Amino acid sequence: VQVLAQRVRDDGADLRWGHRLVGFDQHTDGVVVHVDGPDGPYELPAKYLVGADGGTSQTRKLAGIDFPGMTSHDAVARMAFGVVPPDDWVDPVTGALEIPGWGRVPPAPFYRAEHGVFACRRMGGRAMLITLELARSAQEDRLDDYDEDETPVSLAEIEASVKRVLGADVPLRPVSPDAPLDLRRFYGINSRIASAYRSGRVFLVGDAAHVHSPLGGPGLNLGLQDAVNLGWKLAAVIAGSADPTLLDTYEAERRPAGERVVMHSRAQLALVRPGTEVTALRGLFAELLEDPNNAKRLSDLVSGNDNRYDVGANAHPLAGRWVPDFAVRNGGTTRRVAELARSGRPLLIDLTEDAVVATVTSDVAERITVAAGSPVGDVSATALLVRPDGYVAWASSSPKPEVDELRRVLAQWFGIEAA
């Protein structure tokens, strides 16, 4: 958090801790935000308001945006930070556990047993242990094994949960004598997505727009892609280089991505529930995943790499997709696309022999980053135009790409009129 906070300050952001949104008024040319701060209430004028304030988003509620979905009471999760099992149970090379009375638990992020999910990881001087106890279906309640009055979690409660999940005693201790313990308990699972990602000049990103099971860890990718997608579009509109209608593409692109995460996170949750039927289903999935094509399909789904945006008429297979991971060599310099795409501007990659595509943007060089050279790695294109969020707006595989189409895309997405 400190590193991120310093970075945004370095970029000129006014970061304010301890300030709470209490309301806002929208006008034709801006938003007036009502804030309750440490020194009292005040008003903050802005062009736009972006709510990145989590699953209980005050921004979403004040905007009157519905949050349909489901809240189930079928799960109790417990997390313990700063605790470890006996040292001689841990494989020093792999991190796997050898538990007497149970056997070997692989160092997977989540390990599904017949009666729940278990995870135990140690990274450097930090340690984390998780249990997840689930009912057999989302329609059942699992509320009988914790106190309704939210009694503070104890180490004994964590150990008891581990025993229910694994059927074996696992003694736990602090990672060091003076290490503080952070023990937590969470009830139920929310799977919800905002009915709209926008209301006038107010936008939602991250958990304010969608909540879901954490299994598979898709939330970070999803939320960051929301922010980057909206961020470059807001910047372009506020700078006057793009038409405000560009902002309409935010919800059109990101809400379907959120829907897919809600869908596959529920499916993953179903695959870790207790029961012999689920065990059989997992066995079937294991066989299917031996096929590399199936494994890649699911990997792309969970990571979000299968998202494809509608970027218009360009029919190239890369158009609307995440830019491939390759590098561009020019003379004695080789740079990966990820390095080239850090300016916040559109990136034109020209891989043609005589760099004919790059000349199209010579009169607008201050508004676009151009990289010309030969490809290092697998890329099925001779030229690509990459948006600031990493998605391909235009691509061609022709030795002499059609530059009129490139000009049209530059104008459509970035308001750039190239000669």
Locate predicted features.
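Core Rossmann-like FAD-binding/catalytic domain of the broad FAD-dependent monooxygenase superfamily
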Residues: 1-282, 286-289, 419
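Helical substrate-recognition/capping region of FAD-dependent monooxygenase/halogenase enzymes
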Residues: 2, 6-12, 26, 160-164, ...
